A protein has these predicted regions:
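Catalytic core and acceptor-binding pocket of nucleotide-sugar-dependent glycosyltransferases
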Residues: 104-150
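Buried hydrophobic core signal strongest for RNase H-like alpha/beta domains in large
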Residues: 56-64
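Conserved donor-nucleotide/metal-binding helix-loop-beta segment in metal-dependent transferases, i.e.
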Residues: 85-117
Length: 150
């Protein structure tokens, strides 16, 4: 079974009521091909949600680590503003699209990504930008441990 992990912002997301999460869950229910479970990574679950796994999380990085420890064999990291618009299976979703190029680093987030890009180039690794598609992403524990190793 595939697990889809959705980290929640403690303040209820963009609209402060987790409404985006409702749309994301509905799209998964309608369009994910195959068996799945939903895991919400948050301090507290919304009062209205039922039938999901709760993984305690506090902050994005620690939530990702918590999910990886609880689901070491792998999971989809999904955001509450992601929607699955067409029937899609797990193998298709594991192929994360890459942006065609790197955008100009104007925001703090993009400036951090520029540091990542520069390090990849310095180490002779492919400098691919996976940040623009904004998920979903497939992770397992070994990937997370490697990413946070240095």
């Amino acid at each position: 079974m595939n697990t889809i992990c959705i980290p929640l912002h403690p303040d209820g997301g963009k609209y402060k009521d987790n409404s985006e999460l409702r749309y994301a869950l509905r799209s998964i229910e309608r369009n994910f091909v195959g068996e799945f479970e939903i895991a919400i990574v948050a301090k507290k679950l919304p009062d209205w949600i039922q039938g999901v796994r709760h993984i305690h999380g506090d902050g994005l990085k620690s939530s990702l680590r918590s999910a990886a420890k609880e689901l070491p064999d792998g999971f989809f990291w999904w955001y509450d503003d992601n929607c699955l618009l067409l029937p899609t299976d797990a193998e298709t979703m594991k192929r994360t699209p890459v942006a065609g190029g790197w955008s100009k680093p104007v925001t703090d987030w993009r400036k951090q990504l520029e540091k990542v890009r520069a390090r990849l180039v310095e180490e002779g690794l492919p400098a691919l930008d996976y940040s623009s598609p904004h998920g979903p992403y497939w992770f397992d524990l070994s990937m997370i441990e490697e990413a946070f190793a240095d």
